[in-house]
UniProtKB/Swiss-Prot annotation:
Region forming the signal peptide: 1-29
Segments for region (A): 176-287
Ranges that cross the membrane: 151-171, 175-195, 206-226, 236-256, 266-286
UniProt short sequence motif Nuclear localization signal, positions renumbered to this chain: 317-325
Domain statement: The transmembrane domains are required and sufficient for its oligomerization.
Name of this chain's protein: Nuclear envelope integral membrane protein 1
GO biological process, one term: erythrocyte maturation
Classification via Pfam families: NEMP
Gene expressing this chain: nemp1
Spans annotated as B: 326-395
Subcellular location: Nucleus inner membrane; Nucleus envelope
Keyword Amino-acid biosynthesis belongs to the record: no
UniProt-annotated stretches for the region BAF-binding site (BBS): 368-375
Length: 431
């Protein structure tokens, strides 16, 4: 009974505590509801300056066109000291921020901006509002709205295009494997550490809640680092280099231990992942929704039509090779062979005479090396390159009825007779 009474007393005390905590909320809500919210309208090209907390809203005045594919609309808040800028969807959200909401309180940390802030506005948002909170009265800040071409969106589109069309090549590249592994290790080292600690902790443990909170804290810290990246690079560059060196080496060692992908299925999964990331980058980089979908569909169809086109081209080449086989060359007759030999010989001799008569020809050096300079001089002047004796010997050897022709003719007959004599001998041996 005592235990039950104590338990009931604890429940009563907790209920009273919660009631006391929630008691001021209705009065606070009634105060904020009665108070009219002041909102300052933002216009393109106009800069406003204040030194106190204000609410600002931008309302879309025109429909996006096809020329706004890579156009950005951004709100820049620049201040002399540290401020807090929170982005919301509309004026109703600004009113809700005046009341205390636990979820909005934590989500505002992920949306808040510090000091020099850039808030990007979606072209299709009818209204975008921000709240600038100033802690000191001597803090001055300016708010400006600008609109124009964003080269970063175009760069993201090109990256998505390359990832989609060259995903297969990148998934098999060792350079891409190691560079991606090192980059992921540098950017997500804290998340990886929390993930490794979660593997070591038991499932039913109070540390699970701590790890879940650690993920949120890690994301928040990464967001703060990217916001203050310029200040970190200028003031703490030694620590930044040390961090990049250590984490980069550990990431490289981890990638080197497991090595690049070798299994074909794993490579295909990586290829498909890169292609999906490429399509996603192409979609988010284009500001006009229907144009973004059209570009994604065109890229997908172009990638898939590559295989049918390749098959059609291979089939066309095979059909062309079968139909258009080159005809065998026609053999020359004896008379054509002699005529062609005479024509080509005369042509070559004329070219040789022309070269010997040119200034580039070293006449004295050539004369010192030949046995009959007079015969060479006669040849250059137009005489025949053969003597009558050489002509008669050539006709005797290679002319009609010469020894060379007789050997060719009668040599074939003798070979046939020898084969006919060998066949009976082989037949007798086999018997």
């Amino acid at each position: 009974m005592a235990g039950e009474v104590e338990g009931e007393g604890c429940r009563v005390s907790w209920g009273v505590l919660v009631a006391l905590l929630l008691l001021p909320l209705p009065s606070l809500c009634s105060l904020t509801a009665g108070k009219q919210l002041q909102v300052i309208k933002l216009f393109e090209g106009r800069v406003v300056r204040y030194n106190e907390s204000k609410n600002f809203c931008y309302q879309r005045t025109y429909e996006p066109k096809w020329s706004d594919v890579w156009t950005k609309i951004q709100i820049r808040v620049n201040s002399t000291k540290m401020i807090r800028v929170t982005q919301v969807e509309n004026e109703e959200k600004l009113k809700e921020m005046e009341t205390f909401n636990m979820f909005d309180f934590f989500s505002s940390f992920l949306k808040e901006k510090l000091n020099d802030s850039f808030i990007y506005v979606d072209l299709y948002n009818n209204k975008t509002c921000i709240k600038v909170h100033v802690s000191d009265t001597d803090t001055y800040y300016s708010v400006a709205l600008s609109r124009g071409f964003d080269p970063r969106l175009f760069f993201v589109f090109l990256c998505g295009l390359l990832l989609f069309f060259y995903g297969d090549t990148l998934s098999r590249s060792q350079i891409f494997y190691y560079s991606t592994g090192i980059t992921v290790g540098m950017l997500a080292s804290m998340l990886i550490l929390v993930f490794m600690l979660s593997k070591l902790m038991p499932k039913k443990s109070p540390f699970v809640a701590l790890l879940l909170g650690g993920w949120s804290v890690s994301i928040y810290v990464i967001q703060l680092v990217f916001k203050n990246l310029q200040a970190i690079c200028t003031e703490y560059w030694q620590y930044l280099l040390g961090y990049l060196g250590i984490v980069g080496f550990v990431s490289f060692a981890f990638c080197y231990k497991y090595g690049p992908l070798e299994n074909e299925r794993s490579i295909n999964i990586l290829n498909w992942t890169l292609q999906l990331i490429g399509l996603l980058l192409m979609y988010i980089s284009v500001q006009i929704r229907h144009i973004a979908v059209t570009m994604v569909v065109i890229a997908f169809c172009t990638k898939q039509i590559e295989y049918p086109v390749r098959w059609i081209y291979i089939l066309y080449r095979k059909i062309k090779l079968k139909r258009g086989k080159p005809s065998p060359p026609r053999l020359l007759t004896e008379e054509e062979y002699r005529k062609q030999g005479d024509v080509e010989t005369r042509k070559a001799l004329e070219e040789l005479r022309g070269y010997c008569s040119s200034p580039d020809f070293a006449a004295w050096k050539t004369v010192s090396r030949i046995q009959s300079p007079k015969r060479f001089a006669d040849f250059v002047e137009g005489s025949s390159h053969l003597t009558p004796n050489e002509v008669s010997v050539h006709e005797h050897e290679y002319g009609f009825g010469g020894s060379f022709l007789e050997d060719e003719l009668f040599g074939e007959d003798s070979d046939v007779e020898e084969e006919m004599e060998i066949e009976p001998v082989l037949y007798q041996d086999l018997r």
